[in-house]
Every structure is written in structure tokens, then in C-alpha cells.
Swiss-Prot record:
Classification via NCBIfam families: PRK05170.1-5, PRK05170.2-5
The protein's name in its UniProt record: UPF0260 protein CJA_2436
Disulphide connectivity of cysteines: none
PANTHER family registered for this protein in UniProt: UPF0260 PROTEIN YCGN
Domain of life: Bacteria
A Pfam entry, by short name: CxxCxxCC
Family indicated by similarity: Belongs to the UPF0260 family.
Amino acid sequence: MVAQRVFWAAKTLQEMSPDEFESLCDGCGKCCLHKLEDEDTGDVYYTNVACRHLDHDRCRCTRYDQRQQLVAECVVLTPDSVRDTYWLPETCAYRLVDQGLPLFDWHPLISGDPDSVHTAGMSVAGKVVAENTVALDDLEDYIVRWV
């Protein structure tokens, strides 16, 4: 029997169907965190302040279909935009696949379990606060290193 390569190893992001591309999202919620960028160095710092539409337990957007209309700065990833979205976490499957790297064992496509990202402690579940509970001028006080 010949082993068949999984789609994320056999295709580029551009070759994937929309459903395949969407399934790469592990549901970590890290892209929904407020980030700060050092203007001098370009370094990106994640905070534990999440978008008001992020479900803090499931780490999914509660308004996914309307997210861009509701949050102007919400980035909608496409196969062509991944490479330029430099702030994606190093564990992000979109980034890994674009770089030709394997997915982590805890990724739901590998584990077969949609909760494995949470079980492995790789999601923001239980680690974030909602943006409407903090003063956004104080985001520097919320910088975290666990991303």
C-alpha cells in the first residue's frame, strides 16, 4: 500500500481549497490578541488582551462571518497574505506550511482532536482578558511571553 501525503504537506497554501486552507487554523486564538510593535526594532509583543469577540474558552470568534465589518483591523488571512503577516506566532500552521515545516503533534489535523490545542496548553484559553475590561492605552502592562 502506498502512503498518501496529507494535503498540507502535498500542497502549497495557494493550491489548497478554501476548506483545506481554513482547516489549518488550530484554534489557538493567538491571532486575536492585541499586539504591540516596537517602532525602532520592529519587534512584535503579544498581550493577553483579546478581541471582544473572542470566546475565551473555545478560542473562536463569536462573530466570525462579520469580523471584518465589526473590527476594522481584523486581518483575514489568505494564501497570499500569510507570508506578509509577520506577526503570526511561530506555532501557527499557516506559517509552518508556508515555510515547508511540519505541524505540531497537538495540531487538530494531526491529533484528530479539536481540543488538543487546548489540552497541550498552546491556546489562549484561560489566559486572556477582554479588551473592553482594560484601558487600551495601558496595553504595555499586559505584554506576555507565553505566545
